[in-house]
Amino acid sequence: MQAMLVEAEWAPRGGVAPEPGAAERRLARNGNLVWRRPRFRVTDLPEPPVAPDEVLIRVRACGICGSDVHLYERDAEEYMLYPGLVTTPVVTGHEFSGVVERVGSAIVDFQPGDAVCAEEIAWCGACLACKSGQFNYCSRLEELGFTFNGAHAELVVTRARSCWPIHSLVRRFGAERGFVAAALVEPTSVAYLGMFVQASFRPGQTVAVIGGGPIGLAAVGLGRAAGAGRVVLFEPSAARRQLAEALGTDATFDPRALGPDGVVRAAREESEGRGFDLWVEASGAQGVIDTATRALAPTGTVALIGLGPHRADIDPVTLIRTGSGLRGSLGHSGHGAFGNVIRLMAAGRLDMSRIVTRTVGLNQAVGCLEDLRDREAGKCMVVF
């Protein structure tokens, strides 16, 4: 089968001491500290075996995520920009949908021919976090497309418990568009968890989103679908601001033109002077967290979803005086996120397929990574 693979050199930065056994496993907790000179290529790999609790899926659509672009990009010292859990070599791709090709011997809930999408988070089920229902914070976490082979490939294997049926999306949108929409359930569920679970968003509250990539655009669409009193987006790309308008944002702004103080002023004006109840930070850009805290409503929340290699400076006095706070959010598992997002899409309340601005075959995927470095386009989708 054909697949897109990333490889890199194991070269821990000076002063970085990887945990015992990490070099042998080629597993970095923070790729930006360890992996140097990442390289992508499309190659032929053998068809993967299927364990009793797994399913083999023929991929129909797989998005290229901002995280994939961070795996591709290098800093001044040629380290990959991605600051999360990753091993190499690995097949990338974690936002996908497809058709079940074969099931493991223990599987009763799926059969060949079923249309599915799947969660990227592979939790162990046995650690304290998993026993507490906090699957995204599993101490033995594995991630499809980062620590085991993902779906930028003709075939992918994953555990059946990670899969969700998507027949309702195929019925609503038709096969071609339905599989594309289903591949967007994963990034939309990331935004869903950050907004509704971690930040406890409620209808009528106001939402400001930083970053108009797929997760930021999903936050715009979810805010509108869930009855936000006002939704605004801060995003440098004019093309992405237009996509947000199609999803129902009330206003969009270019933060580079405004500067940090201008962003605060615009946010105050858009919220009648009180600040926003919820800021969704989906960019991973430097300096934006402090800006958001300066335009928070009393007891408001900044949901931190975007991953970036930069450290943040914030003024805790601002948070104390307003009773507001920061909430980190990682992943999408648990809390019914996937099922709820699928139902929102199938009901016509949320159409994330609107953000797809380019579809390519697998052989064009590496070029798409290069093109996405300018953060100007919407979602690039690899289709099979």
Regions found by a protein language model. Give the residues of each.
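A short N-terminal beta-strand-loop micro-motif at the entrance of redox/enzyme domains
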Residues: 11-61, 87, 106
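C-terminal hydrophobic helical "lid"/dimerization subdomain
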Residues: 17-18, 290-294, 298, 335-384
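Glycine-rich beta-strand-centered segment in the early N-terminal region that forms part
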Residues: 46-63, 77-128, 170
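Glycine-rich Rossmann-fold phosphate-binding loop(s) that bind the pyrophosphate
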Residues: 62, 187, 211-214, 307
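NAD(P)H dinucleotide-binding glycine-rich loop of Rossmann-like/cofactor-binding domains
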Residues: 83-94, 124-210, 232
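Adenosine-nucleotide cofactor-binding segment
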Residues: 174, 209-212, 224-291
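Glycine-rich adenosine-cofactor-binding loop
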Residues: 191, 207-224
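Glycine-rich phosphate-binding loop and adjacent beta-alpha segment
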Residues: 250, 286-347, 384
